[in-house]
């Protein structure tokens, strides 16, 4: 087994909406001392910027120009990580249901995927990073040393999302939230460019009946095992 990269390994966590990727990535990054790159937040930042600029989701030329002038960064703020779009903190603004659905459409556009692909590869090239999204292990970093595919039933993912929305004071019914999760799955799995699918060498984890701590321990032990193999290589 070859040695790991300059700063460690690249960990790719893929899976559908609501599978718990963001929460687990943050916790795993903290335990390993790695940098968390939230690729979903990057696409959401593009969607928010496009909405503000009045750029339609099928306007490839407009989206390409938007991405050229958009700088996305992550800033650690204590236990949380803020998402910045051209210096503005958009961490909360990008998490609405409206932006979530728009993101699924815009993220399927080739100019957007290409622009963010380049950003993500630059951010993670030296290792010591955890990236989560829908095509990290298949497209962004197919050579990532550790890959996970995190899933859960649509009902469980909808329930988790419903609780998140309720905690933020957003009005939605459980049935509506589950329906939107299923709709998002169809969009993500059916898009032309980089559809959601499990990498052949990814470790599959169904978190439907597992606690966050159980999933976290499984992920941490897998990464540490890979690091140990690299040290011997």
Swiss-Prot record:
Residues bound to ATP: 15-23
Keyword Magnesium listed: no
Keyword Protease: no
Disulfide bonding pattern of the chain: none
An MF annotation (GO) of this entry: CMP kinase activity
Pfam families reported for this sequence: Cytidylate_kin
Catalytic activity, as annotated: CMP + ATP = CDP + ADP; dCMP + ATP = dCDP + ADP
EC annotation from Swiss-Prot or TrEMBL: 2.7.4.25
Family annotation (Gene3D superfamilies): P-loop containing nucleotide triphosphate hydrolases (3.40.50.300)
Gene that encodes it: cmk
Keyword terms: ATP-binding, Cytoplasm, Kinase, Nucleotide-binding, Transferase
One cellular component term from this protein's GO annotations in UniProt: cytosol
Family under the similarity heading: Belongs to the cytidylate kinase family. Type 1 subfamily.
Top-level enzyme category: transferase
Main location class: cytoplasm
Native organism: Citrifermentans bemidjiense (strain ATCC BAA-1014 / DSM 16622 / JCM 12645 / Bem)
Protein known as: Cytidylate kinase
Biological process terms in GO annotation: nucleobase-containing small molecule interconversion; pyrimidine nucleotide metabolic process
Coiled-coil ranges from the UniProt annotation: none
């Amino acid at each position: 087994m070859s040695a790991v990269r300059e700063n460690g390994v690249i960990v790719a966590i893929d899976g559908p909406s609501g599978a718990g990727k963001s929460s687990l990535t943050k916790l795993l990054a903290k335990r390993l001392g790695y940098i968390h790159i939230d690729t979903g937040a990057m696409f959401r930042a593009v969607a928010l910027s496009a909405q503000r600029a009045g750029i339609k989701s099928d306007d490839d030329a407009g989206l390409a120009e938007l991405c050229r002038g958009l700088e996305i960064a992550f800033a650690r703020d204590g236990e949380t990580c803020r998402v910045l779009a051209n210096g503005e903190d958009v961490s909360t603004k990008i998490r609405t249901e409206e932006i979530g659905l728009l993101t699924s459409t815009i993220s399927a556009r080739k100019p957007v995927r290409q622009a963010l692909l380049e950003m993500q590869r630059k951010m993670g090239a030296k290792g010591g990073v955890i990236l989560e999204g829908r095509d990290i292990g298949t497209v962004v970093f197919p050579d990532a040393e550790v890959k996970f595919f995190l899933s859960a039933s649509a009902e469980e993912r909808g329930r988790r999302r419903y609780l998140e929305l309720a905690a933020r004071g957003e009005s939605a019914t459980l049935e509506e939230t589950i329906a939107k999760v299923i709709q998002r799955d169809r969009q993500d799995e059916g898009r032309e460019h980089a559809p959601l699918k499990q990498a052949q060498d990814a470790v599959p984890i169904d978190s439907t009946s597992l606690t966050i701590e159980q999933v976290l321990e499984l992920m941490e032990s897998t990464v540490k095992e890979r690091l140990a193999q690299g040290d011997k290589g």
